[in-house]
């Protein structure tokens, strides 16, 4: 308290205590000490301190955040493995592996042993729903139960019943390519059109009706919403690792929640429409609907399953198709050999079917090579260690682990000339390539449920596409992988292709 020094005036005023000025410095000093202490702990006292990696990766989350947000994390991890070896510390509590054996250790069946569970990353698949689903369920036993009743939709019998529905959409796709991207045009962006056909197929299979992207000639807004917000999912995946994640989550909630709620409500609406459609068509939902009606499965769970099928199933197929078309057109001798095999096997377009296409050895080699050189899940499938040994190293419980799919499939010790698109490596019995290094669908009890359905799509589309047209890449300077980014899934460049009909016929859409 101080008395006024001005004559004639006498009043008392409060002077702020000295501590108010000091407080910001105290807080700053405490924060600095905390972060210095955290860095010291991560570098020398953390359970993973013995594992090599870039200094910034071992000490903080900054290296991981920078590389994932740039979209080149797959290349950064590959470079890290080249420098530091088969085990790389990507973040203070995260390890990447680059060995064949790590596939089985992390993802394979472990009789009588603890199974590495999915990490928190997979929570995004159930976000916005009041139920877990095949994508977000992290409990191994509950996941097994979900997979068992969903698997009926992906059996050999079910695939044969579903093929006419898929073929109908594929035929419309093939027709539009020729009509809108024919010899007298500037071509079409196959990155966009493969996403559209994959989305239309999943609309038929999950909701009983196409999204009509192919008919309208433009992507559905739901598809665009999913793709445009993959970057925000990458941001959220990084933020969940921070000690103040909940505060940041509340700050970002208006942005992320609006998108999430729009997505989940649209899924609910589409499932409601499918539930009222009592036709006898066989699709992904037909078996689930009977279980919902009998009370075995909750309707919200069914909705969350449908959402996962759309997100995971559509983009992975589209990614493979666009990438494989690019590599085919950049490797003329491969493209020529594949066209000849397909056209020699099928006398007419109408005679093409998935079962026969899957018997074509060179086509299967092309598919395997496409999945190797540009794996849809290139960043890896993150798991949490229960406390186990991988490649002779004990990995403490709670460590986030994965096999770097990109690194193992682009390692010269695994595949000769790994950047070369060479389907013959899958046909040559004398090849020294370690083919089990490529696991695009993962493996073990949580391997991709839709693997066989995806292969049916790929065989049908590639066979019909290469039978009907000679394709022309309009931009020969395009560096497909170099211009791609990874934000959970691939963010791909435009791929402009022109289609020259080989027989001049017009298909009925």
Swiss-Prot record:
<keyword id="KW-1133">Transmembrane helix</keyword>
<dbReference type="InterPro" id="IPR050121">
    <property type="entry name" value="Cytochrome_P450_monoxygenase"/>
</dbReference>
<dbReference type="InterPro" id="IPR002401">
    <property type="entry name" value="Cyt_P450_E_grp-I"/>
</dbReference>
<keyword id="KW-0812">Transmembrane</keyword>
<keyword id="KW-0472">Membrane</keyword>
<comment type="function">
    <text>Cytochrome P450 monooxygenase; part of the gene cluster that mediates the biosynthesis of PR-toxin, a bicyclic sesquiterpene belonging to the eremophilane class and acting as a mycotoxin. The first step of the pathway is catalyzed by the aristolochene synthase which performs the cyclization of trans,trans-farnesyl diphosphate (FPP) to the bicyclic sesquiterpene aristolochene. Following the formation of aristolochene, the non-oxygenated aristolochene is converted to the trioxygenated intermediate eremofortin B, via 7-epi-neopetasone.</text>
</comment>
<dbReference type="Pfam" id="PF00067">
    <property type="entry name" value="p450"/>
</dbReference>
<feature type="transmembrane region" description="Helical">
    <location>
        <begin position="309"/>
        <end position="329"/>
    </location>
</feature>
<dbReference type="GO" id="GO:0043386">
    <property type="term" value="P:mycotoxin biosynthetic process"/>
</dbReference>
<keyword id="KW-0503">Monooxygenase</keyword>
<dbReference type="GO" id="GO:0004497">
    <property type="term" value="F:monooxygenase activity"/>
</dbReference>
<dbReference type="InterPro" id="IPR017972">
    <property type="entry name" value="Cyt_P450_CS"/>
</dbReference>
<feature type="transmembrane region" description="Helical">
    <location>
        <begin position="20"/>
        <end position="40"/>
    </location>
</feature>
<comment type="pathway">
    <text>Sesquiterpene biosynthesis.</text>
</comment>
<keyword id="KW-0479">Metal-binding</keyword>
<dbReference type="GO" id="GO:0016020">
    <property type="term" value="C:membrane"/>
</dbReference>
<keyword id="KW-0408">Iron</keyword>
<feature type="glycosylation site" description="N-linked (GlcNAc...) asparagine">
    <location>
        <position position="353"/>
    </location>
</feature>
<dbReference type="GO" id="GO:0005506">
    <property type="term" value="F:iron ion binding"/>
</dbReference>
<dbReference type="InterPro" id="IPR036396">
    <property type="entry name" value="Cyt_P450_sf"/>
</dbReference>
<keyword id="KW-0325">Glycoprotein</keyword>
<keyword id="KW-0560">Oxidoreductase</keyword>
<dbReference type="InterPro" id="IPR001128">
    <property type="entry name" value="Cyt_P450"/>
</dbReference>
<protein>
    <recommendedName>
        <fullName>Cytochrome P450 monooxygenase ORF9</fullName>
        <ecNumber>1.-.-.-</ecNumber>
    </recommendedName>
</protein>
<dbReference type="GO" id="GO:0020037">
    <property type="term" value="F:heme binding"/>
</dbReference>
<feature type="binding site" description="axial binding residue">
    <location>
        <position position="448"/>
    </location>
    <ligand>
        <name>heme</name>
    </ligand>
</feature>
<keyword id="KW-0349">Heme</keyword>
<dbReference type="GO" id="GO:0016705">
    <property type="term" value="F:oxidoreductase activity, acting on paired donors, with incorporation or reduction of molecular oxygen"/>
</dbReference>
<comment type="similarity">
    <text>Belongs to the cytochrome P450 family.</text>
</comment>
């Amino acid at each position: 308290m101080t008395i006024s020094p001005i004559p004639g005036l006498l009043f008392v005023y409060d002077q702020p205590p000295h501590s108010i000025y000091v407080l910001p410095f105290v807080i700053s000093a405490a924060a600095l000490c905390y972060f210095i202490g955290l860095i010291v702990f991560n570098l020398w006292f953390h359970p993973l301190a013995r594992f090599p990696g870039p200094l910034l990766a071992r000490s903080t989350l900054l290296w991981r955040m920078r590389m994932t947000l740039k979209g080149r994390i797959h290349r950064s991890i590959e470079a890290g493995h080249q420098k530091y070896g088969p085990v790389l510390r990507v973040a203070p509590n995260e390890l990447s592996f680059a060995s064949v054996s790590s596939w089985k250790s992390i993802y394979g069946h472990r009789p009588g042993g603890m199974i590495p569970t999915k990490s928190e990353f997979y929570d995004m698949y159930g976000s916005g729903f009041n139920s877990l689903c095949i994508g977000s369920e992290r409990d191994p036993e509950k996941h097994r139960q979900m997979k068992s009743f969903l698997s009926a939709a992906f059996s050999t019998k079910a695939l044969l019943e579903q093929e006419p529905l898929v073929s109908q959409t594929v035929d419309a796709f093939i027709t539009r390519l020729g009509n809108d991207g024919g010899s007298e045009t500037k071509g079409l962006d196959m990155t966009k059109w493969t996403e559209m056909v994959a989305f239309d197929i999943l609309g038929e299979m999950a909701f009983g009706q196409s999204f009509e992207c192919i008919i309208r000639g433009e992507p559905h807004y739901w598809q665009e919403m999913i793709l445009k917000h993959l970057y925000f999912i990458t941001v959220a995946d990084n933020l969940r690792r921070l000690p103040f994640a909940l505060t940041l989550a509340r700050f970002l909630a208006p942005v992320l929640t609006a998108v999430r709620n729009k997505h989940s409500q649209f899924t609910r609406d589409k499932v409601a429409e499918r539930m009222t459609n009592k036709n006898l068509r066989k699709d992904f939902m037909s078996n689930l609907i009977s279980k919902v009606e009998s009370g075995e499965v909750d309707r919200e769970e069914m909705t969350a399953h449908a959402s996962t099928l759309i997100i995971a199933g559509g983009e992975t197929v589209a990614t493979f198709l666009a990438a494989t078309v690019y590599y085919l057109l950049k490797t003329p001798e491969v493209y020529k050999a594949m066209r000849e095999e397909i056209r020699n096997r099928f006398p007419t377009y109408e005679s093409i079917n998935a079962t026969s296409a899957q018997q074509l050895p060179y086509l299967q080699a092309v598919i395997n090579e496409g999945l190797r050189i540009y794996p849809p899940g290139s960043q890896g499938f993150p798991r949490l260690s229960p406390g186990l040994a991988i490649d002779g190293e004990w990995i403490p419980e709670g460590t986030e682990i994965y096999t770097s799919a990109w690194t193992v499939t682009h390692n010269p010790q695994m595949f000769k000339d790994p950047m070369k698109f060479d389907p013959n490596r899958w046909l040559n019995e004398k090849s020294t390539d370690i083919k089990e290094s490529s696991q695009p669908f993962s493996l073990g009890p949580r391997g991709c449920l839709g693997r066989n359905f995806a292969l049916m799509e790929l065989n049908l589309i590639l066979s019909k596409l290469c039978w009907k047209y000679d394709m022309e890449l309009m931009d020969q300077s395009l560096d497909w992988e170099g211009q791609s980014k990874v934000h959970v899934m691939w963010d791909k460049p435009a791929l402009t292709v022109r289609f020259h009909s080989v027989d001049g016929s017009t298909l009925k859409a």
